[in-house]
Design a protein with these regions (language model features):
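Non-heme Fe(II)-dependent double-stranded beta-helix
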Residues: 2-11, 17-117
Length: 117
């Protein structure tokens, strides 16, 4: 996989198409949609939620848009956070060895728009 390291250095990001196989990402997507609907028993400090006075999921619970440290809670998230291809890509753009410091996921459900925040 080829990364545009120059773009990363100049703009602070680069696109890494095909970094993680789609099948692995679909497992994460399905789990995130389940989290969106309240399918968890995680501590609340793992989530950033939309204003509960305005937004509720289909079960009446809060609508999470951010998940902090999901790899601490479930293997499916650890598999991505510790994915060897992700580590290799980060080492390439950062020009040296890397260490996992944190992990997070963002959730974009159909009811979430730029007007939601």
């Amino acid at each position: 996989m080829q990364l545009d390291v120059q773009q990363y250095r100049e703009q602070g990001y680069t696109v890494a198409r095909g970094l993680i196989p789609t099948a692995e990402l679909l497992r994460i997507r399905m789990r995130l949609m389940d989290l969106l609907e309240g399918g968890h028993s995680w501590p609340p400090d793992h989530f950033q939620v939309l204003d509960p006075a305005r937004f509720r999921n289909s079960k009446g619970g809060p609508v999470p848009v951010g998940v902090q440290r999901p790899a601490r809670c479930e293997q499916v998230f650890r598999d991505i956070a510790e994915h060897p291809r992700l580590e290799q890509a980060m080492a390439q753009v950062l020009d040296g060895p890397v260490e996992l410091f944190t992990d997070q996921a963002l959730i974009k459900g159909p009811q979430i728009s730029g007007q939601s925040f």
